[in-house]
């Protein structure tokens, strides 16, 4: 019995201790916890007293209003996401002040109960969108008609919320955007290229989406062009998930596009449809650009990302692949780039090349020179029409501060380039820098993106491009395409791609990319 009495005594003592733990004590612990995080809130906390006045006096064009409860674990977990977006628009360091007012109301506080009832809050968190003055004296109900206050449906992550806002106001804001005053100074910063891997994935997916939207693969010629570009991506795209997605499309291509006529069926049950493939994974596109984001919604973006993709491909090929890469890039732009004037101008520059490329250096320098010629032409047009990006004017690249050794001499009208130094710079900037600087400064992006990018940005292993006959002989002898075997759905599919000369002839392929993917991770580290 004495043991039972001891347990009862301990229970009473614990109850007394719990009772003595006052709300003030809990508040102290809360303060200690918050001091650990010590993060400044950018979202404006509203209550029943200041609600109308804050919205009435706001100069912002739009507002987001979050209703939450401080006791709600989901609300606490969501707060960092909401704050990521709020820092763009609110506070002294706002990147885009005066565009969107980010606010929140705690429904767990008694004075706010009636306010929350006016908006029919039945779960937490719940987000609303409207011009600020519409919230003044406003209310919302699920059965109300013609209410300018609308519910935000896509909000669960910072990315989703910002993408939703972008759609509402036709913007292209990104979570990592800086103040515009800092952007121009950073354009020549080598470390900025570390963000371009995300833009390369974005541009790859957007190019694929454009092909789907325009149903652009409609003949054996366009089919062959698409296949060649896929082969180039499988071998040398700097993102692993884009290499994987490209390979999956490539090996299923004869089912998707028999006789060069592709299926674009949108029905979920249509297995043999291009729309069922994600060339860079299901998480892409994200809906915004980073390195390539312009100061205006209509500038830079996709075209910039496509250029970065082509440059990154050009510095990853080997000598024997240079002509194949040149043909693949030129044909892809000619068949699938929908800006007609740009397409024709680029095609003319491709046609001006009379001698086949033999060295990887040659294709990298040709693409660099071509890009500068395009910039010169566009700069004249944009300066005369006022259509350029004031924060990112077209320039001869690289600027001297980015690569002083690239310049032998320069005047206002002419530059004498050191092409050896330019090539070294291109290799480093679009190759090594695309990986190493990002890994060094990975804290600047979200944890999820760091984890993904650490895997995605490994430089692909060496690839070999050989004539069709030799490729078939090697395939028969050594079962090449070993690494792609994991993507082959059946052994029959493998034989169709590796052993069937009629299949290859059907697309008039002069060369075949043979990417083994068989190097170890330690070998990839050496390549970096």
UniProtKB/Swiss-Prot annotation:
PROSITE patterns: ERV_ALR, THIOREDOXIN_1, THIOREDOXIN_2. Disulfide bonds join 72-75, 292-304, 339-342, 403-406. GO terms for molecular function: flavin-dependent sulfhydryl oxidase activity; thiol oxidase activity. It catalyses: 2 R'C(R)SH + O2 = R'C(R)S-S(R)CR' + H2O2. Its cofactor is FAD. It comes from the Eukaryota. GO terms for cellular component: extracellular region; Golgi cis cisterna. Residues 35-170 form the Thioredoxin domain. It is found in: Secreted, Cell wall. It is an enzyme of class 1 (oxidoreductase). FAD binds at residues 300, 307, 311, 341, 345, 368-375, 394, 397. The active site is at residues 72, 75. Its EC number is 1.8.3.2. Plants lacking QSOX1 display more sensitivity to the toxic cations lithium and sodium than wild-type plants. This is Sulfhydryl oxidase 1. It comes from Arabidopsis thaliana (Mouse-ear cress).
């Amino acid at each position: 019995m004495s043991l039972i009495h001891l347990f009862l005594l301990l229970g009473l003592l614990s109850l007394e201790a719990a009772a003595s733990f006052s709300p003030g004590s809990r508040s102290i612990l809360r303060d200690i916890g918050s001091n650990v995080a010590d993060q400044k809130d950018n979202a404006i906390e509203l209550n029943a007293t200041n609600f109308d006045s804050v919205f009435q006096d706001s100069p912002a064009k739009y507002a987001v209003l979050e209703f939450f409860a401080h006791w709600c674990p989901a609300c606490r977990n969501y707060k960092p996401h909401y704050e990521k977006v709020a820092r763009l628009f609110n506070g002294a360091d706002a990147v885009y002040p005066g565009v969107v007012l980010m606010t929140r109301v705690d429904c767990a506080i008694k004075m706010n109960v009636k306010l929350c009832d006016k908006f029919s809050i039945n779960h937490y968190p719940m987000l609303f969108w409207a011009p600020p003055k519409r919230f003044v004296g406003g209310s919302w109900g699920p059965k109300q008609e013609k209410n300018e206050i609308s519910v935000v449906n896509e909000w669960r992550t910072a990315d989703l919320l910002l993408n939703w806002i972008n759609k509402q106001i036709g913007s292209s804001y990104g979570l990592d955007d800086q103040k515009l005053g800092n952007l121009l100074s950073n354009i020549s910063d080598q470390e900025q290229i570390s963000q371009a891997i995300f833009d390369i994935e974005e541009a790859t997916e957007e190019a694929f989406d454009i092909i789907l939207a325009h149903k652009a693969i409609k003949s054996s010629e366009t089919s062959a062009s698409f296949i060649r570009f896929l082969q180039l991506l499988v071998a040398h795209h700097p993102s692993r998930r884009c290499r994987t997605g490209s390979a999956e499309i490539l090996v299923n291509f004869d089912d998707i596009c028999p006789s060069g006529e592709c299926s674009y069926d949108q029905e979920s049950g249509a297995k043999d449809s291009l729309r069922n493939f994600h060339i860079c994974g299901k998480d892409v596109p994200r809906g915004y650009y980073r390195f390539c984001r312009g100061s205006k919604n209509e500038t830079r973006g996709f075209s910039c990302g496509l250029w970065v993709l082509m440059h990154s491909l050009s510095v990853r090929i080997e000598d024997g692949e240079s002509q194949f890469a040149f043909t693949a890039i030129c044909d892809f732009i000619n068949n699938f780039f929908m800006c007609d004037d740009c397409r024709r101008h680029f095609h003319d520059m491709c046609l001006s090349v009379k001698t086949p490329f033999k060295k990887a250096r040659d294709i990298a320098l040709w693409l660099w020179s071509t890009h500068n010629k395009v910039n010169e032409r566009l700069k004249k047009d944009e300066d005369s029409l006022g259509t350029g990006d004031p924060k990112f004017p077209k320039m001869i690249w690289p600027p001297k501060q980015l690569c002083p050794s690239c310049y032998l001499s320069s005047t206002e009208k002419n530059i004498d380039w050191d092409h050896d130094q330019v090539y070294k710079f291109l290799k480093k900037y679009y190759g090594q820098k695309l990986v190493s600087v990002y890994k060094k400064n990975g804290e600047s992006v979200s944890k999820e993106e760091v984890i993904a990018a650490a895997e995605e940005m490994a430089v692909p292993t060496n690839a070999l491009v050989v004539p069709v006959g030799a490729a078939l002989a090697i395939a028969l002898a050594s079962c090449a395409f070993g690494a792609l075997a994991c993507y082959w759905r059946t052994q029959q599919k493998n034989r169709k791609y590796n052993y069937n000369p009629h299949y290859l002839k059907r697309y008039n392929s002069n060369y075949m990319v043979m990417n083994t993917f068989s190097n170890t991770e330690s070998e990839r580290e050496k390549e970096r």
